Each structure stands twice: as structure tokens, then as C-alpha cells.
């Protein structure tokens, strides 16, 4: 039997309210048929999450942002600090069906055997909760796959535009086995909403300039 390659699964989380969901998310990953998984939880400015996850979960890595830095920073931090052949960017309110990662890896090996592409784990035609290879990560400066102009919103949408333009985007054929996303109206979502207008303004400015992260590497906030 061919040895499974490692998949690092990045899970940012900021609200203690979601600890039960976070634990459920990780356990659904570990219960899957694809076993060579490495969940990395980013406790985003929340020491309580760091302590609870470290004590209650096995075979995971938990890291702490000393202050809240939000989604884009947290995902990019793991991409910079953890070596892996493949990565999945996820969230703390998902359920991974049993064969989800296995089927997604099969699709990756069929569509992009060198890992230079994104396979969606979401059920909608959006670049959300995707699997990509280390070669894809190395395409980006400082391994920042998610455009650092943004804080929380819009970066995955811009990534969708990039992978479609490059023809490096695919779905597994087994769409029914992709992740379930709860999309709760809770503290995490309320915190994110505070910067939604800011991120959308950046999105429009980048569109006006014709910027597309991954096609080019232009930034507005660092000019």
C-alpha cells in the first residue's frame, strides 16, 4: 500500500464560545479514513482556547497569537512555520465526512500531481476550505498564499479568481462528501463583521488597479 503523504490542516479560532465546535472539527478530521493528518490550531489572541485545546486534543499542534491577528495572518503564519507536502485551510466550525480528505487527495493526485493547484472542500463554487500542495505555497512571496492586504474577508475570493485564471482549480467528483460548514451567527462572526467594510474597500481598490494575488504580487497596504 502506498504511504500517505502528510496533510497539515490549519484551523484559526478566536472565540471560547466555539471550543466545543473546534473539538468536534478536529475529531471529525481524526476519524477520517485518511490518517496522515496534522491539525494545527491557531488560538488567535485567546489563551483559554490554547489551554483547553492543548489538554483535550491529542496528536495536534496548538500555537498562540499573543494578540488577535485574525484569519489571514493566522493561516499565513502556519504556512510559513510548518513544513508539509499538502495543506488544508479550514475553520473551527466544520464537520469533515469520513472520506472527505481521502477523496480530495485523490482529486489532487489526478488533477495536479505536483501539488500546484487547489482542490475545493466546499460544496459551493467558492474557493473555501481548499487543499493545495507545497509547490503552490512556494509560488507566493514569504509563502503568504492569502493576500496580506486583507484581514479576514475577500482573500479567499481573490484566490478563487487566481486559480480559475491559471486553470488550477478543481472539485473532487464525490461532492456529497465535502465539508459541512455551520456558519454560526456568534461572537466569531460578530468580530469579523467589524472589519468587513474595510476588507471590501481594499477588494474594490485592488480590482480597480487590476491586481490579482498570485498572478501578480502587488499590495496596496504596503505601498
Give the ranges of each region predicted by the language model.
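A short, glycine-/small-residue-rich helix N-cap motif at loop->alpha-helix starts
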Residues: 66-73, 79, 129, 151-153
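Active-site nucleotide-sugar/metal-binding loop of Leloir-type enzymes
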Residues: 76-86
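Short beta-strand/loop segment that forms part of the nucleotide-sugar
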Residues: 36-46, 63-65
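Conserved donor NDP-sugar-binding/catalytic core segment of glycosyltransferases
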Residues: 98-129
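Short, acidic, metal-binding catalytic loop of nucleotide-sugar glycosyltransferases
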Residues: 24-36
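C-terminal catalytic/acceptor-binding lobe
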Residues: 153-223
Amino acid at each position: 500500500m502506498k504511504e500517505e503523504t502528510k496533510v497539515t490542516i490549519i484551523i484559526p479560532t478566536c472565540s471560547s464560545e466555539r471550543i466545543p465546535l473546534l473539538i468536534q472539527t478536529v475529531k471529525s478530521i481524526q476519524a477520517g479514513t485518511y490518517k496522515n493528518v496534522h491539525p494545527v490550531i491557531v488560538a488567535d489572541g485567546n489563551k483559554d482556547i490554547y489551554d483547553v485545546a492543548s489538554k483535550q486534543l491529542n496528536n495536534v499542534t496548538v500555537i498562540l497569537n499573543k494578540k488577535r491577528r485574525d484569519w489571514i495572518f493566522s493561516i499565513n503564519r502556519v504556512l510559513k512555520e510548518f513544513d508539509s507536502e499538502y495543506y488544508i485551510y479550514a475553520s473551527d466550525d466544520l464537520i469533515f465526512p469520513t472520506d472527505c480528505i481521502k477523496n480530495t487527495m485523490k482529486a489532487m493526485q489526478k488533477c495536479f500531481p505536483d501539488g500546484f493547484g487547489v482542490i475545493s472542500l466546499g460544496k459551493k463554487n467558492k474557493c473555501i476550505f481548499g487543499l493545495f500542495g507545497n509547490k503552490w505555497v512556494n509560488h507566493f512571496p514569504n509563502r503568504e498564499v492569502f493576500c496580506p492586504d486583507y484581514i479576514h474577508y475577500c482573500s479567499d475570493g481573490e484566490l478563487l479568481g487566481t486559480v480559475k485564471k491559471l486553470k488550477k482549480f478543481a472539485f473532487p467528483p464525490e461532492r456529497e462528501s465535502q465539508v459541512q460548514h455551520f456558519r454560526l451567527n456568534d461572537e466569531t462572526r460578530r468580530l469579523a463583521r467589524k472589519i468587513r467594510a474595510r476588507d471590501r474597500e481594499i477588494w474594490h481598490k485592488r480590482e480597480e488597479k487590476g491586481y490579482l494575488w498570485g498572478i501578480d504580487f502587488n499590495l496596496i497596504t504596503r505601498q
